[in-house]
Amino acid sequence: MKVKYLMLTLVGAIALNASAQENTVPATGQLPAKNVAFARNKAGSNWFVTLQGGVAAQFLNDNNNKDLMDRLGAIGSLSVGKYHSPFFATRLQINGGQAHTFLGKNGEQEINTNFGAAHFDFMFDVVNYFAPYRENRFFHLIPWVGVGYQHKFIGSEWSKDNVESLTANVGVMMAFRLGKRVDFVIEAQAAHSNLNLSRAYNAKKTPVFEDPAGRYYNGFQGMATAGLNFRLGAVGFNAIEPMDYALINDLNGQINRLRSEVEELSKRPVSCPECPEVTPVTKTENILTEKAVLFRFDSHVVDKDQLINLYDVAQFVKETNEPITVVGYADPTGNTQYNEKLSERRAKAVVDVLTGKYGVPSELISVEWKGDSTQPFSKKAWNRVVIVRSK
């Protein structure tokens, strides 16, 4: 009989240990950004403005007969855009300048062509996509594609001898962090601008930018620029943790410790020696153990899965008529003044549930809020909390 009891105990212990193993899931900060969910940023967050200067040149046909260095003309660009995630952005770029065209076997004939253009681009940060997200990363590699419009003209008269065309644009940018809000950027891009919408004609009724032999070509342009990128508004993204694995691991550890204690107690003798009767002295003291109500990032709405804690608090107050204290907190993300207001809203939201939903008398509730000046827990996410305790 003892052998059977021992075997059953061992089998049960093995099964219980297997069911309470720790979750060893990597933290979001260790995963590539493509595998992490990020909170949606606000409308005014993660905007940027880029100012650049550089050179441009025409390619293909007789243009290639001229040495590249002799083809270069000065250009400038202005870009305004926004990052929608750590690795995806859109922008509008306006650029313009010189892009002279060359004819002849040696490119001896030069035509003073200039341009002004605008294109809308879709940008992809390769480094942020494949690496764990860090707002202070030094280097970024950002290829992009876009579509736009270009106005080409000869000489200095914008409206004379001109061509209006759609463009297909492609390029790559390298960004080097200089500070929280400034990057040094280098960019190379190409524009196919032979998708003509309209064109002017010369005195001979021949379209500008054309010649009978088909040697004149002004439809493929390369550009290289460098400059500064300025970040505007709130900078960076916050990862969303769907569950707190550290808390789950801690709870599993407590379960395993309790099971070990139960197993140890089961080894003690069934019978105990007789003890003299002692008249119990009963002293009742009503104390509420601390109850924690957790909140989502930048939220003061009480989630449904937190209502059980507030129900327990309400039952305690109704049964004992003891006063309680409600204290709101916030994690250190953001500025101190905002966190102070956020912790106040969280504390008052808990009071509203206690009084409005569960009928706790308001005169038995004291309300406090401490912003991020006090962090009751070592883990950042746990401090998005309201703690309820006996007064």
Swiss-Prot record:
Q: Which domain of life is it from?
A: Bacteria
The record's section on Pfam families has:
OmpA
GO-annotated cellular components: cell outer membrane; outer membrane
Q: Which Gene3D superfamilies match?
A: OmpA-like domain
Q: Where in the cell is it found?
A: Cell outer membrane
Quaternary structure and partners: Disulfide-linked heterodimer with Omp40.
Protein family according to the UniProt entry: Belongs to the outer membrane OOP (TC 1.B.6) superfamily.
Q: What is this protein called?
A: Outer membrane protein 41
Q: Which organism does this record belong to?
A: Porphyromonas gingivalis (strain ATCC BAA-308 / W83)
